[in-house]
Amino acid sequence: MASAFSAFRVSLSRISPFRDTRFSYPATLALAHTKRIMCNSSHSVSPSPSPSDFSSSSSSSSSSPSTFSLMETSENARWRPMCLYYTHGKCTKMDDPAHLEIFNHDCSKELRVAAADLERKKSQEFNFFLVIDLEGKVEILEFPILIVDAKTMEVVDLFHRFVRPTKMSEQAINKYIEGKYGELGVDRVWHDTAIPFKQVVEEFEVWLAEHDLWDKDTDWGLNDAAFVTCGNWDIKTKIPEQCVVSNINLPPYFMEWINLKDVYLNFYGREARGMVSMMRQCGIKLMGSHHLGIDDTKNITRVVQRMLSEGAVLKLTARRSKSNMRNVEFLFKNRIK
C-alpha cells in the first residue's frame, strides 16, 4: 500500500468539475467568507512551552515554535479559503482567474512541511493518519477528512462532504443551516452540495478503497491507518448516533481511533481541552473559520504535523469492544475525561 503514496499527490486534481451554472461561487459569498476568515486569522497565539516526551527522550523533543516551519513558507504568505464547490467536485470556475485568485483549490500547499521538520520525527505504528472533525449537533452537517502521510507528514488527499439531515423538516434545516453556516458565508454552497449521510458513507468507502485504506472484506479497522480526532465525540458518539438516524449499520472502520487530546496530554505533560487551546499552547496561528469543519480539520492537521515534528508517537487511544460495540475501551491511563 505504501507504494501507492510514494510520491506526494493530492487526488482532487483528478476531479473534472461539473459544468452546471448552479454551482458558480458568487463573488459576494467569496467576499463574506474571506472577510470572516481574515477576522479569525488575526488571532495571535502564545509560544509553546518545551514538550516533555513521554515515550523516551523528553529533553530531545523540546523546541520553540519557530523551529517548525509549516506556516513560514511562501505559499502561506496569503492564506485563501478553500473553494467548497471544488471539494465536492462541482467547481465551474477553474478557468476563471478572479476565482482562482480568491479561492484555494489545493490545501496541500498551506500544509507543507520543510525537510528540517522531519529530523526529530519518530517511527509511527501507522503509515497514514485520517484527521476528522465533524460538524453538527442534531445530525451531522459536515464530514471532512484529510489523509496525512506519517513518514513525510504531507497531506495526501482530502474528502469533504456537506451532509443533509434525514429526520428534519426543510424549515428546520433552513433555520439550522442559516444559523450554523450563514454567518460563515457558506450556507448557499451547503444547500447546493449537501447529500444524505448514507450517500456520504458510500462515497467515502469508494475513496478509502481508492487509497487502499479499506476493503469490504475487512470486518475491523483500516489498512495501516488510523483516524485522528480532537476528542472522542466524533467517532465514539456522533457517528453511531447518525447511523441509527440514517438506518445504516455502523461501518467496521469506525472501531478505533486516536484522540489527539490524550496523546497531547501525555506528550507535552499539559492539558488542552480543544483545538484552539492546543494551537495557542503550541504557538500555531488559527487559520480559517472556527467551526467550519474543513478549516478545523486543517488546523488539527497542523497540530498533528507539529507534534510529529517534535517526536510524538500517535498511538490508538480508544477501541470498541467486538462483543458489544457500545462499549469503548480507553487505552491511555492518563487521559482527558
Curated annotation (Swiss-Prot):
Where's the active site on this chain? E135, H291
Binding-site list for Mg(2+) 2: D133, D234
Q: Under which main EC class is this enzyme filed?
A: hydrolase
List the record's Gene Ontology CC terms alphabetically. Answer: mitochondrion
Q: Where does Mg(2+) 1 bind?
A: D133, E135, D296
Would I find Magnesium among this entry's keywords? yes
Q: Where is this region: Disordered?
A: 42-68
Which InterPro entries does UniProt cross-reference here?
3-5_Exoribonuclease, ERI-1_3'hExo-like, Exonuclease_RNaseT/DNA_pol3, RNaseH-like_sf, RNaseH_sf
Where in the chain are disulfide-linked cysteines found? none
Does this entry carry the keyword Nuclease?
yes
Do you know which Pfam families this protein is assigned to? RNase_T
Q: Where is the composition biased (Low complexity)?
A: 42-66
Any GO BP: regulatory ncRNA-mediated post-transcriptional gene silencing
Q: What EC number(s) is this enzyme filed under? A: 3.1.-.-
- Superkingdom of origin organism: Eukaryota
Q: Which GO terms describe its molecular function?
A: 3'-5'-RNA exonuclease activity; metal ion binding; nucleic acid binding; RNA endonuclease activity, producing 5'-phosphomonoesters
Ranges where the Exonuclease domain occurs: 129-304
Question: What keywords does the record list, in alphabetical order?
Answer: Exonuclease, Hydrolase, Magnesium, Metal-binding, Nuclease
Which residues make up the binding site for AMP? E135, H291
Q: Which SMART domains match?
A: EXOIII
What is the protein's given name? Uncharacterized exonuclease domain-containing protein At3g15140
What taxonomic lineage is listed for the species of origin? Eukaryota, Viridiplantae, Streptophyta, Embryophyta, Tracheophyta
